[in-house]
């Protein structure tokens, strides 16, 4: 895979100032958010639940960076992320609702593993600067944790960035020269790392539990 130097330069430069342009919300109340998050649990807490069309796994939200989730909800509400169900749901939530729900979902933010699982494919070199070597240590809270996410969801997200369905100029530049085979390799690697969990696990333990716990 060839990634254009200009795209990488833009990615790094904008990434370093990403925090300044993120849409921050009020401090969240995780206790209230746990109640409000029942609306999320119906899809994101069901094992093996998939979006109908196109077909892909509904993403894991447990342990995800709260600021990233707030930005995602804002994107769904505003139409920058096209998804009818999520648009309808996000549009009903106030700024405080979003802050509370995401505070609960973040719980204890996923921490990097002491040892990376497997050998990272060369294509992940374009991901680690922002998402970390195992996808669990992001350079800022507005970037998503990838570790433990469903591989097919990661592929779907990358495809949407490439097609422009998800409006993000940074990611659009990064994935422009990446093919489907590379998408799958990236997704499989990050998906097998310790990381995110379903809202069902989060409700039971108030955090994403490691296999050894």
Region annotations inferred by a language model:
Residues 19-25:
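Sec/Tat signal peptide C-region and signal peptidase I cleavage site
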Residues 34, 47-76, 87-92, 128, ...:
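Gly/Gly-Pro-rich "capping" loops immediately C-terminal to redox-active cysteine motifs
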